[in-house]
Amino acid sequence: YGTRLTCGLIKNKLEEFGLAGKTKFVEIVPRQKIKLGCFTVEPIHVNHSIPDAVAFAIDSPAGTIIQTGDFKIDYTPLACGPTDLATLSEYGQKGVLAL
């Protein structure tokens, strides 16, 4: 699972080492939820120095966790648009176990 950029970078490396075609890629898109067993994962666009970055809202039977490597709030980013504060706010209003 990865964003378009992430999948592309990994595919290039696999080709470089003769491993292309041995891995299944699933491209994720912000706000498009993914069901994995008892978990629902929603990628959320975040502004970052690396393009195409996302955080993850992970819904489980115990509650919701927001996972992100790091984040910044930049209202005037040069590329990729600002962090999706509306979606993060929605999760905050519902309640989050951990960030």
What annotation goes with each model-predicted range?
Residues 1-99:
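His/Asp/Glu-rich metal-coordinating catalytic cores
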